[in-house]
Structures are given as structure tokens and as C-alpha cells.
Amino acid sequence: DFISVEVKDKNAFKDDIALAYLWSDDVQKLRDHMLYFWKEALAPSNPDDIRLILYSEQDENEVIECIKEDFGEFQNVLHEVASADIHLDVALIPPQEDRDYYTLCTIGAGAYRMDIEREIRTQYHLSEYAEYIMYLPSDWKLDNESLMDEANYWPFRLLKNTARLPLWTESWLTMGHTLGTEEGEPYSEEYPYNNSILIYPAPFVATREDKCNLSSGKTILFHHILPITQEELEFKNENGTAALLERIFPKGCDEMDVIISRLKREGIS
């Protein structure tokens, strides 16, 4: 089996064309990968065009299946009504018997390819694609009327702003990166958090990444956004990510209990 590609405009190629040989036990998957990469490479582009960045139907379906498999089944999705760049929906994964909390997960952020320098990408084995999650207490108000109140909506705003930040700033995000509010103000008056750190999804917040390998060849990472205080940010800057996570998640603790307790309103001093 082989793939034949006819290129009519050879001027579109640079002089340093390389030849690569690929072997695979899964010919169908290899073909899908090659077709995806050729389509991306040969697609005409206009720097003045502003187009909506979307998953292919197949990629989106596979991402949704990964979310269901890794984080839980869901029926409700907070759909974005208008999108100027990335179309970002948020899956609402309800509490279950074995997990008394909500999981919010973006659907759409991974359609955007983050701008990571090749040397950094290869040295640290980074993916250029990511989705973002947050965990909320099971009593968080998520009905339409309640989400009109910023006190309930701010986690969604944080998810969406974080997901769009690499596009807005032509940069990239990965585990250990921190983000702050523009004026240093808390995300909500009810909480002391005005910064966030990206960590791995619980329960392996410091040691194991969660990823979704698509048949198109993309690898989508799932980053957990953990709100932190200004003091915790300063501690992290002085001592490093590992030290901060050891402080927030003491040895032997239940990581999810810690995450949820930090967002319980009655537990805020």
C-alpha cells in the first residue's frame, strides 16, 4: 500500500525537500496520518484570513470519547454561541457515586496548534495540542440562571481564557506554567485565588499526564487548571513547581479532596 500525491504547483515547496520512509503495522492508521499531514501542509493560506479554528468531525468525536473514558460520561455541554477564533464548548461531567464532584472539560482548544519551538518540543517531549479541565464541588450551581452570576461562572471564564491564551499571545502552555489575572484581582470575591497553575489531572497531579492520541496523528494533552493564591505563586517562583505541589498536596493526602476543599465556599476563611 502506498499514497500518491500529485502537486501541480511545485513552487510552493522550498528547496530543501527531504525524503522519509515510514513503516507501520497499522497501514490504515499510517495512511490517515499521512493524509492529515499532507492536507495541513498543502492547504492554501492567506495571512489576512480570519477563520474559525475547529476540529475535524473525526478528531472531535475521538476527543469526546477520550473525555468520557478518562473523566466520565456526560450529556450536558455548555455550547459557545459566538466564537471569533477557537470554538470552545465545555463538557459538564456530573458527580457520580465514586466521585462527588463536577468535572469541566473544554472541547475545541486542541484544534489550535500551539507555537512551541522545535528544540523545546523535542527536548521535553511536548505536545502542541491541549484541552483544559477543572473540578468543582458537587453543590456548585450550574443551571442557566446561576451561571449568569460571575460567582458561579468564573471557572468557565478561566477555562476559556486559559485555552485561548496561546492563540492570543502566540505562545504555549504546559504543566507547571502559571497564569494570573490582569490586575491581580481574585477570580471571584468569594475566593483568595488570583493565579492558576497547570498540573496533571488528579489523582496523579505531579507525575502522570493524561493524553488522547487521535487517529489523525495529533496528541491532545489534558491540563488541569488549579487556582492558587498570590502567596502560593510567590512560593512557586522561589521554590519551584514540585515544592508547591508537595505543599498543596501533602504526602498521603487524597488529591481530589484537597482540590475540592479549596473551592468549597463554606471552607473559605
Can you annotate each of these PLM segments?
Residues 1-269:
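Short linear motifs embedded in intrinsically disordered, proline/glycine-rich low-complexity segments
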